[in-house]
Amino acid sequence: LRIQYGTSYAYPVSFMGSHVSIAPNHQIFRNTSLKLRGDVAYFGTFGYELDLGKLSAKELDEVREQIRFMKKYRKLIQQGTFYRLKDPFTGNAAAWMVVSDDRRQAIVGYYKMLAHPCTPYTWMKLAGLDEAADYTVRIDDREEMGQFTGAELMRAGLDTTDFSAGEQSREEGRHCTDFWSRLFVVEAK
């Protein structure tokens, strides 16, 4: 996350090599989810550096979904205006987003590094949207989170609270672990 964040100061998203690697990682042996690795890799050239033949059927389905997502949003991600939202060098999260030229569509990547119990509720202010537009926000391009104006999303922010803030969930992907991520798809109505 820090490497990609820092690289974004010198290179556009379309120039950054960003791939889903094997887990545990072969250099530092950290074990992160396929979802997190994909969510980070979207904001670069996107590819895979692992033996697909060693993945489970469930993991292969997830890879197919990641490829579908990237094909659907490639133009936006590669050519949109990039905004840095949370600096991983100064906090426990990294976040960035890309916004289309007409400001009708955006993809937000939010990445929490280490999980802590009883964290406060958090909001993250977005950037580059049309203040007067009405937007629908979906989590991971599936679950609708709500409808908000651009002004709400940029001034009050987007709820980034994880389930360590007192809520409990055993649903896969809904509970917060170390190196946890969430994508938000923001589209004008």
Language model: regions and residue ranges:
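Glycan-recognition surfaces
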Residues: 1-53
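Flexible loop/turn segments at secondary-structure boundaries
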Residues: 24-28, 49-51, 57-59, 115-118, ...
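Catalytic cores of secreted or luminal carbohydrate-active enzymes
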Residues: 35-86
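A generic secondary-structure signal marking the coil-to-beta-strand transition
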Residues: 39, 104-106, 180-182
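Conserved, mostly hydrophobic/aromatic
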Residues: 41, 108, 137
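Carbohydrate-binding surface patches
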Residues: 88-131
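C-terminal beta-sandwich/jelly-roll accessory domains of carbohydrate-active enzymes
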Residues: 114-189
